[in-house]
Curated annotation (Swiss-Prot):
Pfam families: DeoC (PF01791). It comes from Streptococcus pneumoniae (strain CGSP14). Gene3D superfamilies: Aldolase class I (3.20.20.70). InterPro entries: Aldolase_TIM (IPR013785), DeoC (IPR011343), DeoC/FbaB/LacD_aldolase (IPR002915), DeoC_typeI (IPR028581). It catalyses: 2-deoxy-D-ribose 5-phosphate = D-glyceraldehyde 3-phosphate + acetaldehyde. It comes from the Bacteria. The active site is at 89 (proton donor/acceptor), 151 (schiff-base intermediate with acetaldehyde), 180 (proton donor/acceptor). Catalyzes a reversible aldol reaction between acetaldehyde and D-glyceraldehyde 3-phosphate to generate 2-deoxy-D-ribose 5-phosphate. This is Deoxyribose-phosphate aldolase. Keywords: Cytoplasm, Lyase, Schiff base. The keyword Methyltransferase does not apply. It is found in: Cytoplasm. The keyword tRNA processing does not apply.
Amino acid sequence: MKLNKYIDHTLLKQDAKKKQIDSLLSEAREYGFASVCVNPTWVEHAKKGLEGTDVKVCTVVGFPLGATTSAVKAFETKEAIQNGADEIDMVINVGALKSGNLALVESDIRAVVEASGDKLVKVIIEACLLTDQEKVVVCQLAQKAGADFVKTSTGFSTGGATIADVTLMRETVGSDMGVKAAGGARSYADALAFVEAGATRIGTSAGVAILKGELADGDY
């Protein structure tokens, strides 16, 4: 198994410096990760830094709270793609889901899907804040809205991916969608366990350590 191709090599910290982003890009080129995941302000820089490779540029929308309006999320998506983004990781409107406003949750996802054109859209459900029933419902809504992936976590809330959540999400969406486990993978064994549970992507800042068989310091 080429585990490197499962990894979205991630740096989303608000205080990330250019030299840290450059290091992320250098590692992505060396290890051939699936993508780098960076904040929108770094997309154009990342695109230039990865020219000549097959590493994709992934960015985030409505991040990390998911509480911006659908129009704002759609604008963010369009601008990110204009700047070179290949993949969009959007955050759902968690408050709307908790309030039972499923129509808003679905239309919010659909707004990003439509704005993304042919680019990949991953829907962050922030599983640590949801009941199992809510996880099932929102995965179904993401599927209905035409998204490509469901993703466990932002890495900025109360917890990251768990095997139980990845298993439930995979069972819910079947084989038609990708499942991204974000946070929670701190070792090669962790990453492998997520893949075996049904993950087709792993979001982590510790991709290099994982591939080297080392134990990572952080959770994301």
